[in-house]
């Protein structure tokens, strides 16, 4: 193993572990601020094995994205100024020649010509994520390969349906649309009357009582009248109204996925 990449949060210890084994490490960050925190707390101690820094753009990259509370998921930012800020920070701590790997939205290198051999950005590389899925060696179904080559604006959605609660990009499939519709049938609730949560509703076959905002009671009653009679609780103190059949399917999926 010559090198490892690591993201999924703030991998403070990856530099220490990689250096101990003589392996280069390539942390994944989504902003200069994230790298600054990693550098100050840990990476300055293992700079000799820092092979590069992967910048994973919060709006262009697929999968989970490192959006902070200071960034609007619905207002994408140009990646060039963000990567330039990262380079300036790296140069200030002696990493002017350490490569930055641009990840997210990279399909054709011709789209990035102004990045290559740019003295302000310094050494730059590019990470392909989706494109290798189209190769002959890729085991995914041909139907998915065809879908990837025909995507248009609006076919990729930045959403929060992941169990992690983080923003992530996904192709706007029928399943994502189903999750959107479910999410629209969601209200906050309390087990007992509290503050403005004074409107009582009874849900499920046992008529379990819960308290919601008065405006939400009217919505909930309409959803239940339309057949969405089961209220599934979420960790965010909300309930999602679904049909009895949907509830059974969700519970089965949860049981089948236990430990997976």
Please place each PLM-identified region on the residue numbering.
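Active-site entrance/lid segments in N-terminal catalytic domains of soluble metabolic enzymes
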Residues: 1-95
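A short glycine-centered flexible hinge/capping loop motif at secondary-structure junctions
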Residues: 101-108
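Conserved active-site-proximal phosphate/metal-binding subdomains
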Residues: 60-77, 87-97, 109-260
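Generic beta-sheet signal
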Residues: 28, 56, 103, 128-129
């Amino acid at each position: 193993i010559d090198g490892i990449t690591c993201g999924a949060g703030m991998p403070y210890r990856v530099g220490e572990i990689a250096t101990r084994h003589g392996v280069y490490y390539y942390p994944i960050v989504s902003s200069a601020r994230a790298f600054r925190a990693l550098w100050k707390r840990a990476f300055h101690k293992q700079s000799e094995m820092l092979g590069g820094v992967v910048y994973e753009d919060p709006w262009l990259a697929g999968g989970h994205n490192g959006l902070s509370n200071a960034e609007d998921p619905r207002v994408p930012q140009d990646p060039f100024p963000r990567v330039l800020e990262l380079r300036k920070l790296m140069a200030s701590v002696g990493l002017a020649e350490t490569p930055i790997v641009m990840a997210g939205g990279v399909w054709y290198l011709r789209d990035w010509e102004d990045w290559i051999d740019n003295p302000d950005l310094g050494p730059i590389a590019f990470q392909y994520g989706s494109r290798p899925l189209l190769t002959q060696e890729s085991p995914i179904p041909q139907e998915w390969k065809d879908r990837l080559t025909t995507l248009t604006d609006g076919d990729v959605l930045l959403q929060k349906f992941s169990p992690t609660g983080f923003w992530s990009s996904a192709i706007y499939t029928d399943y994502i649309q189903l999750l959107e519709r479910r999410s629209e049938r969601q209200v906050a609730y309390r087990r007992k009357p509290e503050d403005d949560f004074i409107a009582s509703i009874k849900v499920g076959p046992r008529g379990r009582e819960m308290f919601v905002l008065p405006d939400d009671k009217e919505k909930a009653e309409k959803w239940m009248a339309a057949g969405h009679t089961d209220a599934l609780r979420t960790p965010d103190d909300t309930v999602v109204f679904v049909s009895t059949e949907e509830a059974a399917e969700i519970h089965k999926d949860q049981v089948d996925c236990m430990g997976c």
